[in-house]
Amino acid sequence: MRVAYSVIAGKKMNYKKGTLVCVGPGMVLGAHITERCKNHIKQADIVFTSCHPVIEKWLATLNSCTYSLQHLYADNKDRRNTYQQMQAAMLAEVRNNKKVVGAFYGHPGVFAQVPHHSIKQATEEGFEAWMEPGISADACLYADMGIDPGAYGCQQFEASQFMFYQRKLDPSAYVILWQLGHAGDLSLTPRLTGAPERQVLVDMLLEYYAPSHQVAIYESPFLPTQQPRIIWQRLDELPKADISLISTLVIPPGRRLIPNDEIVIRLKSIYPASHGKNTNKALGE
């Protein structure tokens, strides 16, 4: 068991017996899970899973007391109610002084409300709870598509959140819109939205990009034998694209980086003249 300290007071915490650890088995079956996460699953009293069905079956081979939370989803059911039920199921076992593991697709902290809320609630109730990282979809995307997010910068949004709120894009950076299959969904149900909602999204993106700008639909594989799905097409063709609930939209930069000359001049004034060549190299000059 971890020895944990209060972030505020720096004092050792006295925890109740039950524990909760949320882990991520990664994206690809058996290939991404860390030994640390695997050991947590093997040593748990009970494991709850919310992953691809194939991955859930494999996790059950590591611990026979494994239960899927997927049955809590239902057509026309508010996803927030489903998340509350998932959280309640795990916390009930923690309160029974069990070592509980929640295994969530990819990274348990990325596009997954239940692990964050469950850990917060467990901690507030005096139980030890924490998260172990896993390989997430963005890590796979960078590798599969050869993208370095540090080269031009990278903005990431959940597609519906981008649509519902006044967000600003930087078209000189990569833009990644997650959960494209739910884009524009106001019902908060598990349904797949369609061409009309995606047309609204495209209309918003056309404020920043040309209709012919090339964008990619990306899907990470689940099995080691599968290849990633990467489909390139024009931005204005997105409404009629073949989209699934695991589709992600990747938008490459649509314009060059614009130098901030005023700031560069200020920074150059800080350095001695002998460093001029190095400062020019840093700016790619």
Can you describe what each PLM-predicted range is?
Residues 8-23, 128-130, 137-285:
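Beta-strand/loop-alpha-helix module characteristic of Rossmann-like adenine-cofactor folds
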Residues 2-132, 247-248, 272-285:
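Class I S-adenosyl-L-methionine
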